[in-house]
């Protein structure tokens, strides 16, 4: 090999190494830019999540609509954390002549329903703005507790309404564990710490304590409904506070709701306006898609099988 050829090969190798280094640097720059954009987007999305969003609010008077949909509970769409900023925005908007609670829910946890109810009453008192609740398919249990915060409750004649009661449900696996040869090992400090363990036998003491807990929460529910509905309730109605449900037309007769109607008719009648604007939480892009993958199979199984706390919830399937 001549010196000239060797020099050429050396230069060629040097150039190739330099080009590879440039490519590596460009790759790092591109990766950094992509990461920066992703972090900026996620930060903005996190900032925007939960902020009230009012779509195309008209210049004139309108009714502000806040939807209560699905099961009520912490971490769900119908939670105090999600609905509180929407309710605040609805009451504070000057040309919103009234607030509508558009409800389609079987209920949920007593605490979340009570928090939402109490906040509506607080805002209504502070801003002196009328509130109506409009029930769609379901207006039961915890959802009904929220509805009684309104001045007027409206529903369709086929709406299912009522279910003033509390339920706690779960499963027992003692027989299955015995068949599978599985031994339950648990240690507690405090005799009530393992109350209603699904992997152990249910005792009479457990049943008595759970019943006392449910009855206390039920009493809170009844007190709120009685106070808010007042003389409109027919207290002689059989099953009124025992979890009974009625269709919309039946519910009017017993004072559970006030009148039959729909959203548009109700806002025209009670607020004297035609326009309605729905307030919704501002969600980041792809949040709905990501939500579907947020629970692992094991998490979902545990949530399904584990005993549930008290629920102000109406079950349509038994």
Question: Where do the model's predicted regions map?
Answer:
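N-terminal organellar transit peptides
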Residues: 1-132, 137-139, 145-156, 168-318
């Amino acid at each position: 090999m001549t010196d000239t050829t060797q020099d050429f090969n050396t230069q060629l190798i040097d150039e190739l190494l330099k080009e590879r280094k440039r490519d590596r640097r460009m790759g790092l720059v591109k990766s950094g830019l992509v990461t920066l954009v992703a972090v900026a987007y996620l930060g903005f999305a996190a900032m925007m999540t939960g902020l009230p969003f009012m779509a195309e609010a008209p210049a004139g008077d309108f009714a502000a609509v806040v939807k209560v949909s699905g099961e009520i509970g912490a971490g769900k769409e119908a939670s105090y954390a999600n609905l509180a900023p929407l309710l605040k925005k609805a009451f504070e908007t000057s040309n919103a002549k009234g607030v509508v609670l558009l409800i389609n829910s079987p209920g949920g946890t007593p605490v979340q329903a009570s928090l939402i109810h109490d906040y509506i009453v607080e805002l209504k008192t502070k801003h002196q703005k009328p509130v109506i609740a409009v029930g769609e398919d379901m207006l039961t249990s915890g959802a009904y507790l929220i509805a009684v915060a309104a001045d007027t409750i409206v529903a369709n004649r086929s709406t299912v309404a009522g279910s003033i009661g509390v339920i706690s449900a779960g499963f027992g696996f003692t027989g299955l564990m015995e068949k599978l040869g599985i031994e339950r090992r648990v240690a507690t400090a405090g005799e009530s710490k393992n109350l209603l363990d699904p992997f152990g036998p249910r005792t009479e003491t457990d049943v008595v304590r759970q019943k006392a807990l449910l009855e206390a929460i039920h009493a809170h529910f009844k007190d709120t409904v009685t106070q808010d509905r007042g003389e409109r309730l027919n207290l002689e109605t059989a099953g009124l506070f025992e979890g009974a449900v009625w269709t919309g037309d039946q519910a009017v007769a017993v004072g559970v709701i006030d009148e039959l109607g729909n959203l548009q008719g109700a806002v025209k009648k009670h607020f004297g306006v035609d326009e309605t604007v729905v307030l919704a939480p501002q969600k980041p892009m792809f949040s709905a898609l990501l939500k579907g993958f947020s629970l692992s199979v094991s998490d979902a199984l545990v949530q399904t099988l584990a005993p549930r706390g008290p629920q102000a919830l109406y079950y349509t399937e038994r």
